[in-house]
Amino acid sequence: MKRITRIIRPIICMAVLLFAMTTAVMGCYQKETEPIDIPGRTPSGTSAPQPSATPAGEVIPSVDRQAELAEARAKNPDTVAWLYIPGAEVDDPVMQAEDNGYYLKLDENGEYAMWGCYYAHCENEIGSRDKLDKNTTIFGHSASNCDPDGVRFTKLYRYMDADFVKENPYIYLSVDGDDLIFQITALFITDIEFDYINPNPIGGELTDFFQTVERKNWLDFDGVTFSEEDTV
């Protein structure tokens, strides 16, 4: 049985050129801005998750990417996790370096690639479930045309359709010995004035973080809430 980590934040950051983010900050609030319906979506993953039952009886699809994670790490020791987002067709390793700019134009094998790879914020600690920071950030490129069938995190624009989010509510992050399930509870576009990459906001910073997420969130999720106790 998988324990659900209550927050992931699909945040699409438009202020950084060709740069997007996929961390999901969830919540259940009425917003003035309506989500944008993007036609022509083709949501499909590379493999079908297997269901597992939660204590409440809800069936949550679970995945196992430990073999893929181990293989990727054998090829590149900078590999720290495996990211699986079925709705965005993401099923790839996550790198991490001492500088966030290192993998900007390098793929997971360390070779030049215009669209880079997925990589974690250099200040995040990514190990076991218990070692995750309060706020984990994963970076990836996004094309300026916002094509929901485009490269890398450009596909996150599919999540601007509320119905699509309901059909694809989970994101998976595999770390050493554990396959984590995150539930999407918020969606919004932000600029870099919001410090959304702070690994461990505390006190007033933490309160401000969640209040900002609540204010920016576009979608309502019936029965799904988030709080300062959650990991994002």
List the model feature ranges, each with a label.
Residues 2, 19-20, 51:
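Low-complexity intrinsically disordered segments
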Residues 1-14:
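N-terminal Sec-pathway targeting helices
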